[in-house]
A protein has these predicted regions:
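AAA+ P-loop NTPase catalytic core and its hallmark functional loops
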Residues: 1-190
Length: 190
């Protein structure tokens, strides 16, 4: 799967000048809100978009909570698209109990690493297509399992004062994946 991503990414060309330099926060919020409405027919108020932007400025890890149907998953996806970025949605399962559920696992019998959706998203974020763009990974419905169990390694790295790194998985021609600087993790829960 990861080789397919590499092949699809070769020869990527950045689309010319869709974006301009905004003058102030109000203009950024207006631009994002208008793009989200035009691209996805999603309508968020200015306060919601300002809070989301403020959160992004403060931390790389966010938890969006609210009742079903309020747009917890749609917001990061539409926001990333409005800024020319991308959001990958990783569905958390009720049975997730350890790091293998989030990071995948190595099968010693077939001598193959079975990457998870989360690792595929991290890998995609490192591809040249997204080298200078926002990339958001959404762990959707995190309330279905305990993040302390399946995401302990990720939480530990994100809370560390040093630059976060991923556990050594040895992907990409024996090079371990790096966590891109413009990668943001979002979680949703009710």
């Amino acid at each position: 799967e990861l080789e397919r991503m590499d092949a699809a990414d070769s020869g990527f060309q950045d689309p010319p000048g869709r974006f301009h330099q905004p003058a102030n926060l109000k203009q950024v919020v207006d631009d994002v809100r208008n793009r989200m409405a035009a691209d996805e027919a999603l309508f968020y108020d200015d306060r919601t978009i300002r809070c989301f932007l403020g959160g992004l400025a403060m931390s790389r890890l966010h938890l969006l909570q609210g009742i079903s149907g309020t747009g917890k998953t749609s917001l990061p996806r539409a926001f990333a698209k409005a800024l020319g970025g991308h959001a990958d949605i990783v569905a958390v399962q009720a049975g997730w109990r350890d790091r293998q559920d989030l990071l995948g696992y190595y099968n010693a019998f077939d001598k193959k690493y079975h990457e998870s959706s989360f690792v595929k998203a991290l890998y995609a974020a490192q591809c040249p297509t997204w080298s200078d763009r926002l990339f958001i990974v959404v762990l959707d419905e995190m309330n279905l399992s305990y993040i302390e169990q399946f995401g302990a390694d990720l939480l530990s790295e994100l809370e560390s004062p040093k630059k976060p790194n991923l556990p050594q998985l040895g992907l990409m021609d024996s090079r371990p994946p790096r966590r891109p600087t413009r990668l943001l993790e979002e979680g949703t829960a009710i």
